[in-house]
Amino acid sequence: MPQGDPQGEPAFREAIRGYLHSARGVNCTAEQIVVGAGTEYLLMLLSRILGPDHTIAMENPTYKQAYRVFESLGYPVVPVEMDGSGLETSLLEGSGADIAYVMPSHQYPTGIVMPVKRRQELLSWAYKKEGRYLIEDDYDSEFRYKGKPIPALQGMDGRERVIYSGTFSKSIAPAIRVSYLVLPKPLLAVYKERVNFYTSTVSRIDQNILYQFMVSGCYE
């Protein structure tokens, strides 16, 4: 059996695209999706796309594994304090960071849900300077304890500044090491130039099983 598409099987990526659009309000094409074995792997892949000269801002407290990945890759990491609405954008401006890693839908470990106004402030920060990006980790958006979910930050972005990250590990089982990135179109072009030769780290068999699960309607 051939190795398949480095980004993930086209039909599987199209199923992810359809689900993200209907469930999370994410606006993308299947071509913008990159499938990989776990969020940590995809963050390492993302580092090859972004390059070395960046400073990463992260919510304090945050997901320690992502913090360790960024540190191990040599990025300066700046913790930014939160209030009841999430990461404080006024502090972000003075942090010196040009990339911010955030979990607006259900911040880990605090559980804060970032309101729309704060999300708009984050986007305004990203738009102020060329080369700024937001990494949106939407790791467990399928779960809600009360109220309706707020659509993803990516769906509010009109200037291609949000890198969206999702996973099947929380919604199905931790052993399902299948995650995905939605790359802004400018970064997709860089991906194809720099790392498109990497073989997909998720087997075609696993991708097809998940694809069948999604198109059958069982996932939703």
What is the role of each PLM region?
Residues 2-131, 142, 148-156, 160:
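Conserved core of the PLP fold type I
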Residues 64-69, 97, 133-134, 144, ...:
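A generic "structured core" feature
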Residues 163-220:
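PLP-dependent aminotransferase class I/II
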